């Protein structure tokens, strides 16, 4: 399989911001192009999802999770405890006061650690606290150029001022390296999984 992505102004801006405007090239399918098939996805119709333990395919839309959090957590806990003999996962206790409570968050990797994504997180956290003592947030930019730009535009400062830990660019959080949650903690991560 391969995919074809049409470059646009956002792509051009990315190269310009990263000091490589000459690297931008307009790309689109040729007028005379033959393909075995087409899978067209209107990304504006795709709902945000979350992958829950114990497998990346165990996904729910954010709306489903918000509406049925306690039931979903019971199902995950029961399935995990059957799957891992002798283990007693307790994820249901993370649901109280009508919400899921987490102790750790991570924004990292090629999917989560993008410049735009980290800027959005910084904008949300600006002037706020991410919950020092109750919640730990680590942010791993996906590249050194992204980190440098976050420092230049002030977003790195906003994250640090909110109590987030700004980490080095590092390929590892996606597979669990770094920021291992403490026993019994619930960690939520925006990474490639």
What are the functions of these language-model segments?
Residues 1-193:
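Fe-S-dependent hydro-lyases/dehydratases of central metabolism
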